[in-house]
């Protein structure tokens, strides 16, 4: 939760990186919703960030700039070239930010999310961060906690993909 929480503090380079991370997740959601897939590398990186609750720094979550390049490019595109795809991504970003703000104001729910992520991390250590059980666990955690907050995010895309349980679970994780 540290990565999202840092966005609401005084502007810093860490805030910019955290915001790029939110954009990156939103881009991956949009790609899953419209194309039905993201690369294993992208999914693994996003899941690793999610499971790292206590990073030394925000930049350590992403490694090199290439680890957050999709998010940085998405922010740049949002400013320079508004398309329907970028409009959807921006809507997801705003929804994520809204839900993160509401979540951080609820200590009981934030503890529940933290405990759930800790359990998923243990599971990922045993399997892998992209194992279907880890993804199902985090998707269930999202459904039980974050999705109960008023102001749900409506993901739009190809119904063929969005109706597939494995893709819906990945969307909830991201």
Provide a role label for each language-model segment.
Residues 15-18, 92, 116, 141, ...:
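Alpha-helical structural motif
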Residues 1, 5-8, 75, 92, ...:
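Generic signal for short, ordered secondary-structure residues
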Residues 2-81:
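Leu/Val/Ala/Ile-rich N-terminal alpha-helices, chiefly Sec-type signal peptides and the beginnings
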Residues 2, 86, 111, 140-144, ...:
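N-proximal short alpha-helices
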Residues 118-129, 133-169:
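Long, contiguous alpha-helical segments
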Residues 23, 27-34, 98-101, 121, ...:
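Alpha-helical repeat scaffolds in large eukaryotic proteins
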Residues 50-138:
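Long amphipathic alpha-helical segments with strong coiled-coil/leucine-zipper propensity
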Residues 170-174:
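Alpha-helical oligomerization segments
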């Amino acid at each position: 939760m540290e990565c999202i929480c840092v966005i609401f503090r005084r502007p810093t380079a860490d805030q910019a990186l955290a915001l790029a991370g939110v954009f990156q997740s939103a881009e991956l959601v949009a790609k899953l919703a419209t194309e039905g897939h993201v690369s294993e590398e992208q999914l693994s990186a996003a899941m690793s960030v999610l499971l790292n609750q206590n990073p030394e720094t925000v930049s350590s979550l992403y490694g090199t700039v290439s680890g957050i390049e999709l998010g940085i490019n998405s922010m740049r595109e949002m400013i320079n070239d508004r398309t329907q795809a970028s409009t959807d991504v921006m809507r997801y970003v705003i929804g994520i930010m809204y839900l993160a703000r509401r979540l951080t104001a609820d200590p009981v729910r934030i503890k529940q999310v933290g405990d759930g992520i800790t359990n998923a991390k243990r599971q990922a250590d045993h399997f892998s961060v992209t194992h279907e059980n880890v993804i199902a666990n985090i998707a269930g955690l999202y459904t039980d906690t974050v999705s109960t907050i008023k102001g749900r995010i409506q993901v739009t895309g190809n119904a063929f993909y969005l109706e597939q349980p494995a893709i819906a679970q990945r969307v909830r994780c991201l």
